[in-house]
């Protein structure tokens, strides 16, 4: 079924296809048409951050930005689902066109720019979902918010999503919001994390519930930059790390149509770079902070390699677009 749908969608503009798919999933997730993507996957539980995940394969943030299709992705058999990135206020994102396929490398370039309907809308969608599994909510800052006021945006989102999330991911690594990646380094990172951890403690008392905070990092990091980040993670006591976001590197797609488009590159061409960061990160953290691996996970082999590198949980996005829901089952069955 997916192969037929994909053949049609790949004749259309990439963002139009994305929007069509989200709307279709939204309309079918609660009726018999969900048979098109619903599948049974055996449980392979993983304990992580004190939470039981029914299997280690999750949906990465960015596909269901507004949490409109949670039950559809649950029907596909994901072990956990991450929605967002969401910002305090709704925003349109960057100018179109802003999403491009590079089929030769099963890759996608996007410069969406955190387009979303705002955190209040997302929370309402989460409340309406029937899903009772592990839900991550990925939060960001509005484009118009200055870097030195970024913490306020993250705190607004954290307070609003806290009661509804299994974990919260702080996105400081998208390349499509000007200045955002500057928050990954030095004092800026430490101050951001300290502010978030302080509010987490307040919210834990208020809601009588501890919700872990994870940081999503970029793959485009020098070893010294990664060392600095690890120091901040250990000093502040961050709960977990998601590695990695999309890359600005184009070495693996040179000469392909759309290769020089601005934005973050994801897909199979990211496999080696993300694998390297996860391996290095897990070595440096030495088990003190757990890691979720994402980026170019397009096969059972890639999934196993990421898990063996030290990330017991993994996420997929681009490979799901190219291969369909069967990929989830193939990975889980192989583990």
From Swiss-Prot:
Cofactor(s) recorded in Swiss-Prot or TrEMBL:
FMN
Top-level taxon: Bacteria
Please provide, alphabetically and separated by semicolons, the GO molecular function terms listed in this UniProt record.
Answer: dihydroorotate dehydrogenase (quinone) activity
SUPFAM superfamilies, per the entry: FMN-linked oxidoreductases
Q: Name the enzyme group at the top EC level.
A: oxidoreductase
Q: How does it sit in the membrane?
A: Peripheral membrane protein
Provide the family line: Belongs to the dihydroorotate dehydrogenase family. Type 2 subfamily.
Output this protein's name: Dihydroorotate dehydrogenase (quinone)
- Can you name the source organism? Pseudoalteromonas atlantica (strain T6c / ATCC BAA-1087)
């Amino acid at each position: 079924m997916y192969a037929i749908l994909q053949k049609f969608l790949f004749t259309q503009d990439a963002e139009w296809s994305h929007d069509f798919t989200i709307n279709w999933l939204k309309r079918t997730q609660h009726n018999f048409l969900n048979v098109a993507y619903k599948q049974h996957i055996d449980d392979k539980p993983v304990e992580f951050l004190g939470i039981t995940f029914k299997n280690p394969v999750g949906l990465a943030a960015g596909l269901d930005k507004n949490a409109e299709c949670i039950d559809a992705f649950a029907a596909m058999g994901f072990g956990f689902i991450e929605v967002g990135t969401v910002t305090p206020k709704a925003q349109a994102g960057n100018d179109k066109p802003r999403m491009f396929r590079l089929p030769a490398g099963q890759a996608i370039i996007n410069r969406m720019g955190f387009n979303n309907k705002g955190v209040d809308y997302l929370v309402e969608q989460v409340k309406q979902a029937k899903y009772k599994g592990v839900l991550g909510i990925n939060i960001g800052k509005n484009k118009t918010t200055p870097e030195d006021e970024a913490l306020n945006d993250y705190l607004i989102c954290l307070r609003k999503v806290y009661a509804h999330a299994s974990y919260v991911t702080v996105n400081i690594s998208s390349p499509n919001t000007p200045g955002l990646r500057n928050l990954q380094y030095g004092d800026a990172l430490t101050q951001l994390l300290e502010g978030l951890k302080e509010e987490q403690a307040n919210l834990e008392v208020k809601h009588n519930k501890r919700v872990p905070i994870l940081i999503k990092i970029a793959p485009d990091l020098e070893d010294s930059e990664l060392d600095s980040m690890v120091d901040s993670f250990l000093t502040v006591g961050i709960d977990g790390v998601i590695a990695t976001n999309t890359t600005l590197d184009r070495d693996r797609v040179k000469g392909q149509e759309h290769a020089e488009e601005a934005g973050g590159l994801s897909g199979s061409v990211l496999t080696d770079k993300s694998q390297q960061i996860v391996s290095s990160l897990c070595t440096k953290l030495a088990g003190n902070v757990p890691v979720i691996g994402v980026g170019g996970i397009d096969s059972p082999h890639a999934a196993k390699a990421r898990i063996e590198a030290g990330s017991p949980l993994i996420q997929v996005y681009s490979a799901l677009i190219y291969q369909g829901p069967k990929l989830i089952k193939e990975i889980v069955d192989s583990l």
